[in-house]
């Protein structure tokens, strides 16, 4: 397997909220899309040029959120053939997403 360069384009996190709090009416994929769009904007690249997104997501509350990272990447403007990798590891989700991407 050829070595591939992993580039951290930028790091952005969502707002911090409590369960059932001010973000309760926002779909997780919509919140994720906002975060991904901002990460891409800070990186200064075209969303269609990003081929892989690693997303940390904590505690999906409904089975329809099983593919939240995929929906979020598409809603953020990434290409349909891009890869969306989702990690759900409670408080360690974001850090595990970075580690797993590097592997």
What is each stretch, according to the model?
Residues 1-82:
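Conserved "HGTGT" condensation-loop signature of ketosynthase/thiolase-family condensing enzymes
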Residues 88-103:
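Active-site-proximal alpha-helical scaffold in enzymes
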């Amino acid at each position: 397997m050829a070595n591939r360069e992993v580039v951290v384009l930028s790091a952005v996190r969502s707002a911090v909220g409590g369960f059932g709090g001010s973000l309760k009416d926002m779909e997780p994929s919509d919140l994720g899309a906002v975060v991904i769009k901002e990460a891409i904007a800070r990186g200064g690249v075209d969303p269609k040029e990003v081929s892989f997104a690693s997303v940390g997501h904590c505690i999906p509350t409904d089975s329809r959120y099983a593919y939240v990272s995929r929906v979020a990447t598409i809603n953020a403007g990434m290409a349909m053939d891009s890869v969306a990798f989702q990690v759900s590891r409670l408080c360690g989700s974001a850090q595990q997403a970075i580690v797993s991407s590097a592997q």
